[in-house]
């Protein structure tokens, strides 16, 4: 089960610098300092999404990201079940739509290549007690 399969929202293509500044992600190198550099992944997800239709609409970057994870599992002969967290029914439906996205080998290679250049640490760095509340008290 992949942890945070949509990169805390980054791979949805909806995360902005402003949203990062207002969240706990502001202290994370992958999201704040390297936002622009890591956008190449989102750009590629969007480009691949343009080649797929889900429920009569162009696929979303999130759907492609989830399909990419599942297909990586197939490559290694492992069952992969991404479980993205969400609080909105629309996102649950969107995420389920990823099952209709069947990526080609060429699309997988494109996504694999661009992901090799992601910058910044993936996990949170704990810098003291304030990381939990992000100074919201």
Which residues are covered by each model-predicted region?
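Cytosolic histidine kinase catalytic core of two-component systems
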Residues: 40, 105-106
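Aromatic-lined glycan-binding groove of carbohydrate-active enzymes
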Residues: 1-23, 60
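Short Lys/Arg-rich basic patches
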Residues: 22-30
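Eukaryotic N-terminal low-complexity, Ser/Thr- and Lys/Arg-rich leader segments
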Residues: 133-137
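Tryptophan-centric aromatic hotspots in well-structured domains and transmembrane helices
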Residues: 3-4, 68, 115-117, 121
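C-terminal anion-handling pockets and recognition modules
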Residues: 111
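Conserved short secondary-structure transition element at the edge of the structured enzyme core
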Residues: 5, 33-100
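Short coil/turn segments at secondary-structure boundaries
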Residues: 124-129
């Amino acid at each position: 089960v992949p942890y945070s399969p949509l990169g805390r929202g980054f791979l949805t293509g909806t995360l902005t610098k402003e949203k990062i500044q207002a969240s706990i992600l502001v202290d994370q190198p992958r999201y704040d300092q390297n936002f622009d550099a890591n956008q190449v992944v989102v750009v590629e997800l969007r480009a691949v999404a343009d080649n797929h239709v889900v429920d009569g609409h162009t696929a979303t970057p999130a759907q492609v990201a989830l399909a990419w994870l599942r297909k990586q599992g197939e490559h290694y002969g492992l069952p992969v079940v991404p479980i993205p967290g969400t609080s909105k029914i629309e996102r649950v439906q969107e995420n389920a739509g990823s099952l209709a996205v069947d990526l080609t080998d060429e699309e997988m290679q494109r996504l694999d290549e661009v992901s090799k250049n992601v910058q910044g640490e993936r996990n949170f760095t704990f810098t003291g007690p304030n990381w939990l509340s992000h100074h919201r008290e």
